[in-house]
Structures are given as C-alpha cells and as structure tokens.
Amino acid sequence: MVISPLALRRLSYGLIALVLLSALILVWTALQRQESTLAIRPVSQGASVPDGFYIWHHLDANGIQFKSITPQDDVLLIKFDSSAQSAAAKVVLDRSLPRGYIIALQDDQSQTAVWLTRLRDTSHRFG
C-alpha cells in the first residue's frame, strides 16, 4: 500500500493543527484558574490565629463561599475561587475580627504563573 505525497501532506497538516488546537485549549484553561488566598496572622508573636470555625461562620453568614481554611505555622490561609470573593471576605473579616490580626491577600505562585513570568521575562532578552 503506497500513500501519496498529497495524502501525507494533508495528514501532517491535520496533525499539526490538532496539536496547536490542543495547546491553545490547554493554555486557555490554565489561564482561567484565578484562585486567590487570604492570609490571617496575628500582629504580636505568641498570639494565636483565629478559630477556623469562627471564620467559616462569618463568611457563611455573609454568603461568601470559600474552598478551604487551613492553618499553616502561625498563619490561617483561606482559599477562594476568585479575587472578588477574596476581596469581599477581607471586608467582612476586617469588620468581624478583633484588632490584632493582619488580613492580607497572598499571591498564589501557581505553575502557570511561574511559567508565564518566565516566558515574559525571556522575551525581553531577545533583540
């Protein structure tokens, strides 16, 4: 069975188009993840972080959904699906937590963000 050069060319173009389309879909889905994290830490050393149930209660009472609440060292990390949820939670927690806690947005260095930063930085080195 002999395959004509025209058929091979069409097959190779089709495979290249399929690979490019797959790569574009993969990049697009990676960019759509906009996870956001709030970090709550005490101002003074030795003070404890707020109770996770207390945080859950106040966020739930205000209709703010979150992915997880995790204590890590002397910090309480709250993960959200979007930065809008994180900003709304910061407003609620600023009102409801007693003084003595720092509530800050924490940058999530996901693999996607790291690779995009590398690609952006390397493009400026050419030329």
UniProtKB/Swiss-Prot annotation:
- Pull the Periplasmic topological domain ranges from the record: 32-127
The entry's cellular-component GO terms read:
plasma membrane
MF terms (GO), sorted A to Z: protein kinase binding
Q: What Pfam families does this protein map onto?
A: SecD-TM1
For this UniProt record, the keywords arranged alphabetically read as follows: Cell inner membrane, Cell membrane, Membrane, Transmembrane, Transmembrane helix
Name of the protein in question: Modulator protein MzrA
Keyword Lipid metabolism listed? The answer is no
Primary site of residence: membrane
Which function does this protein serve?
A: Modulates the activity of the EnvZ/OmpR two-component regulatory system, probably by directly modulating EnvZ enzymatic activity and increasing stability of phosphorylated OmpR.
Task: Tell me what topology the record assigns in the membrane.
Answer: Single-pass membrane protein
Family according to the record: Belongs to the MzrA family.
Which residue ranges are assigned to the Cytoplasmic compartment in the record's topology? Answer: 1-10
Ranges annotated as spanning the membrane: 11-31
Cellular compartments annotated: Cell inner membrane
Complexes and interactors: Interacts with EnvZ.
Query: By its UniProt entry, which InterPro entries does this protein fall under?
Result: Modulator_MzrA, SecD-TM
